[in-house]
Amino acid sequence: MVTVVDRVTDRRLRHPEKAHRPDTSVQKKPDWIRVKAPTSQVYKETHGIVRAHKLVTVCEEAGCPNIGECWSQRHASFMILGEICTRACAFCNVATGIPFAVDENEPERVADAVARMELKHVVITSVDRDDLADGGAEHFAKVIYAIRRKAPKTTIEVLTPDFRHKDGALEIVVAAKPDVFNHNLETVPSKYLKVRPGARYFHSIRLLQRVKELDPTIFTKSGIMVGLGEERNEILQLMDDLRSADVDFMTIGQYLQPTRKHHPVIRFVPPEEFESFAKIGKVKGFLHMASNPLTRSSHHAGDDFAILQKARDEKFALQR
């Protein structure tokens, strides 16, 4: 388990808003959560490319359990707009506080790394930047355009913040035409006040719906964590809400507590329940469902994109 103190310097707290909270209990992880430590040469090469281009990855910042597997396959999810978030969600390990100025050279560095790694599919995400007039939307667009120039065969997936109170921001990102637009709901609405207090559930639903209205050709995607105390019927209702917004793809994974200052794991959901959600999601009309304890938004994103394309082609063929 990581510490609440920033890895870069002992003088800056990673989560200052959580520093004085009492420690919460930490449950022992069940066997189905175990992952192997990263040791491969390709993992080291991926790490070297990320460092050489002075880039930030959500794989590291969020403490993703799949980093060893993904980096060993040259898969990486780049986090733009800095590494300090303006919000303080109870589940997230990304550092919080006052961000630095936007790095205008970042789009070219990201594109260079994508080209060098010869990525077939790349995921671009960011911290929340409530301090920026457009929430960072223009920067997202610049990154997309830079990748299109330097790695034209690479498909692009964006995982965006909610752009709350940022009129016109969503339109800027959609106009840049990512192949997949992902925005995570994270949890059921009854848990928002404690888990995701800076966001609004139905604003996020509307954001996803608006993407389809602006450009129906873009795949839409959203994900949640389970194990935060939600009820099964709440998850099923959330699925219906996403389908009402015409969302194509849903991910469901187990919440893992980053530190003792974060929201505790209320329950480790067994694999068979994840399998059940996957089956129900397909019945409800999602083109694809990724649902297992170690599922994360960017995990197997390239493979999932291929599945989405095939599923949509088959759907259109049946409608002819």
Swiss-Prot record:
Q: Which GO terms describe its molecular function?
A: 4 iron, 4 sulfur cluster binding; lipoate synthase activity; metal ion binding
List residues binding [4Fe-4S] cluster 1: C59, C64, C70, S298
Q: Which UniProt keywords apply?
A: 4Fe-4S, Cytoplasm, Iron, Iron-sulfur, Metal-binding, S-adenosyl-L-methionine, Transferase
Q: Which reaction does it catalyse?
A: [[Fe-S] cluster scaffold protein carrying a second [4Fe-4S](2+) cluster] + N(6)-octanoyl-L-lysyl-[protein] + 2 oxidized [2Fe-2S]-[ferredoxin] + 2 S-adenosyl-L-methionine + 4 H(+) = [[Fe-S] cluster scaffold protein] + N(6)-[(R)-dihydrolipoyl]-L-lysyl-[protein] + 4 Fe(3+) + 2 hydrogen sulfide + 2 5'-deoxyadenosine + 2 L-methionine + 2 reduced [2Fe-2S]-[ferredoxin]
Q: Which PROSITE patterns match?
A: RADICAL_SAM
According to the record, the residues making up region (Disordered) are 1-28
Positions bound to [4Fe-4S] cluster 2: C85, C89, C92
Q: Where in or outside the cell?
A: Cytoplasm
Q: Which family does it belong to?
A: Belongs to the radical SAM superfamily. Lipoyl synthase family.
> What is the protein's name according to its record?
Lipoyl synthase
Gene source species? Bartonella henselae (strain ATCC 49882 / DSM 28221 / CCUG 30454 / Houston 1) (Rochalimaea henselae)
